[in-house]
Amino acid sequence: GGMLAEQMLVFFVLLFCFVVVGEKIAQYFSPGILNTKNTVKCMLLPVSPSEYLSPSELQQKMDRVVEKVRKSPTVIAFGKSKWLVPYTRPEEMYLSDSIQIGTRKMHVFLKFADKYMNQVFQLQMEEGEWLTDELLEDGSCPAVITSQLMQELGWSRGIGKRIYYKGTVFTVVGIVTGIKQEPLKASRPTMIVPNRIQPDQWFEYMVRVKEGETDNFRNLMNKEFNLMMGKEPVRLSFGNIEKWKLNDMRDVFITLLGIGIPTIFLFLFAFIGT
């Protein structure tokens, strides 16, 4: 009786491990995983406060570097965004805020992006088109929302719907399948709006390069950056988003393996002992 109870306990622990691993794998393949292969994050890092240029002026210089490098044959797409780049921070550290639809208010994740960012991450459009930084003909701002926000609102069609945020009117121009902020978590209700909504704050620069061209891109970017910045106390750093994603996933699965492997051995020994 005692041996059977031990076997049953080990069996249920092992079953729990398999269920958790299965859920994590299912969450990874759920809608909204961004394509980060062959992408590079370019980070502008002030070494010390500039005596001559403000942060916004430094950013304008960086914009000119990006505009020039964007024309390189090594580059597929080079964009600028805020809070859109995934896997760089825990989900709770991404920006979320309240939006209004009619009389209803709801809390959603907010992203800011330019017209290139959907090409950088190869976002999957379900309906409509990606946004630009230009106002629409009626004077409203374009917005793209995730299908999860559509579901939350109970909309069967989202294109043309109005959303209000901090006194600005947005018109939905596109729907994406999702935007996952962590690889092993589901996509959340999210709204993406143009960079112009918050023009004077920090931005994240992301590029998609052709296969095998990462080193050539970095060399070119460093060259143009140094030419533009001169002796300004600022440096350029590169981040590998794909590696960060894999590290995030590895940490989760190592924890699960730490539980699962001893449980498997206990399971085997429990049956060998019968």
Where are these regions (language model features)?
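Hydrophobic alpha-helical transmembrane segments of multi-pass inner-membrane transport and secretion
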Residues: 1-24, 251-274
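Hydrophobic alpha-helices of bacterial signal-transduction systems
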Residues: 5, 9, 13, 18, ...
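A structural signal for well-ordered alpha-helical scaffolds and beta->alpha junctions
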Residues: 17, 21, 58-63, 110-114, ...
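Membrane-proximal extracellular/periplasmic loop immediately following the first transmembrane helix
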Residues: 21-104
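"Rare, low-scoring activations can occur
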Residues: 65-76, 147-148, 167-253
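Short, solvent-exposed polar/charged micro-motifs at secondary-structure junctions
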Residues: 87-93, 138, 243-250
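Short, contiguous acidic/charged loop-to-helix segments that flank catalytic cores in large enzymes
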Residues: 101-106, 133-137, 192-197, 206-212, ...
